[in-house]
Amino acid sequence: MVFEYDPDKSTENKRKHGIDFGDARRLWADAALVEIPARTTDELRWLLIGKIDEKHWSAIITRRGENVRLISVRRSRDEEVVLYESEDI
């Protein structure tokens, strides 16, 4: 899988949320990674919820051909953690 992202946005994401997009690629190592279509009106995007080092993280991505473009990553909200931990997915 090929990841793409804006390096400046990755740096800003690290400053704001404590994780850059390079480290966020580790979400895909989580066998329980949850992927949900995000509510958008323009480009198709997905919300991913997974764990890195036992912490829940949420990412917004889009797909460009075979590539995955990281748009943002942050610590998961409480309701996202509940969704991740749910067996109803």
Predicted features, each with a name:
Residues 1-89:
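Ribonuclease/tRNase effector modules and their secretory precursors
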